[in-house]
């Protein structure tokens, strides 16, 4: 369901979310987060969740289901934005560091939003139905070939 991707790992948005997750892991492993255990865990979980939701959504067979998981990934990214603001407020990171990570989040959101829009469109539903028909026809032809043997 990733517009040409054969699996979720080929989706550019998943690659972006994974890179963001890794950057958050590096950030929260720094000594500045040593006293912020709960905030560290929340930020780590939200970043991990975004990439996971993108992957899980890809595994859904219906465009509406896929879109729902991408919306959850979107919400997790916005949760990360809030946790990064909390980290600034608690002096675990600087505003400059927050701004850099926020830029990455905005970039991922820009990748997610058109994909969500497509998955909610009539075009996506029509494409899924076309693929289902083609698959059924191939199976039917395969059975006829086997019957002829």
Task: State each model region's role.
Residues 1-149:
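Amphipathic alpha-helical assembly/interaction segments
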